[in-house]
């Protein structure tokens, strides 16, 4: 799959419409975590260096096609200005029509313009061709730097890309390269770690992975469903008993594809789910009837450590236990730190993504050691499921 990048585009003197993700958390009208804003800086700076005029398009929250003051991108302007010191950043109170047209016409070289929330228009989420055409009128080139919104065919992510010469921004480019290295043409053996609470939410993911990876590690509440499918009692643990047949199908599909599935060998159980709860480690088949499985045990971690050490590529989505509460974060922490160590030693390419996953790796202090951490959430999951992402497909040459 090929796509153009900023290096392929002549941007001098051109207005460049850049789709970015600045959907940041806010409290009392102030940005509490500016990570997503900071990540778009390399793209904006590169466009400025090439003599282009960056005009930023983004959504914020879910206003459902109406103007909602608390979801105005005007609130993000101070944090964006902080991320681009020395660059004048202006704001236009719409993303189409006379106001942005005048603001674009008034731009000087070296300035940046942020447009209002694209989702204030109902046509954005419907991928309305008229809205996309009105956006396209504002610029000469389109750059998509919002991989996190690439799984949605919206006017500003898909429709617009088909109307102007288009390229991937630096963040999008990094994400696509990392994902291509992990699942497109990976170095083998490939290990996928899939955790989280429910099999039902990750069915497509598991079905796609068993045909593409050499080892599939299943953790979290999801592992309990697979244990139940094998006739193992899990006490009061979270398990989707109605998914047992589906779990058995995944196991047989994996066997046919030559993919080894790894389930917990021992588990940490407790009678209550709270920090510091009295707990014990037991063999997987020996979970007491009145207890619940909250983490994988040390034998499991030791076995996984051998699997990781033999791997060349690793993809991670979802924790191995109830990582939010100590001591049930032990397996996730130990596994994450080992992956980070192998990656730093040059033995492993490691890519992780999904909200809980990023939180778990940060908590373990391991995130910095991974080759690539995707902040994309839904788009990362759909990519792992093998689905075409409209925002990426629209950039493909």
Swiss-Prot record:
Per UniProt, which keywords does this protein have? ATP-binding, Cytoplasm, Glycolysis, Kinase, Nucleotide-binding, Transferase
Kindly give the InterPro entries that the UniProt entry links to this protein.
Phosphoglycerate_kinase, Phosphoglycerate_kinase_CS, Phosphoglycerate_kinase_N, Phosphoglycerate_kinase_sf
SUPFAM superfamilies the UniProt entry points to:
Phosphoglycerate kinase (SSF53748)
What residues does substrate bind to?
Answer: 21-23, 36, 59-62, 119, 152
Q: Kindly state which reaction or reactions the protein catalyses.
A: (2R)-3-phosphoglycerate + ATP = (2R)-3-phospho-glyceroyl phosphate + ADP
Task: Please name the pathway.
Answer: Carbohydrate degradation; glycolysis; pyruvate from D-glyceraldehyde 3-phosphate: step 2/5
* PROSITE patterns, sorted: PGLYCERATE_KINASE
Gene3D superfamilies linked: Phosphoglycerate kinase, N-terminal domain (3.40.50.1260)
GO MF terms, alphabetically ordered: ADP binding; ATP binding; phosphoglycerate kinase activity
Grouped into one coarse class, the protein's main location is cytoplasm
- Give residues annotated as binding ATP: 202, 324, 354-357
Which Gene Ontology terms describe the biological processes this protein takes part in?
A: gluconeogenesis; glycolytic process
Broad enzyme group:
transferase
| Localisation per UniProt entry | Cytoplasm
Query: What domain of life?
Result: Bacteria
Gene Ontology cellular-component terms for this entry are:
cytosol
- Similarity field: Belongs to the phosphoglycerate kinase family.
Task: Describe, as the record does, how this protein assembles with itself and its partners.
Answer: Monomer.
What is the protein name for this chain? Phosphoglycerate kinase
Instruction: State the organism named in the record.
Output: Cereibacter sphaeroides (strain ATCC 17023 / DSM 158 / JCM 6121 / CCUG 31486 / LMG 2827 / NBRC 12203 / NCIMB 8253 / ATH 2.4.1.) (Rhodobacter sphaeroides)
Instruction: Please name the taxonomic classification of the source.
Output: Bacteria, Pseudomonadati, Pseudomonadota, Alphaproteobacteria, Rhodobacterales
- The gene designation is pgk
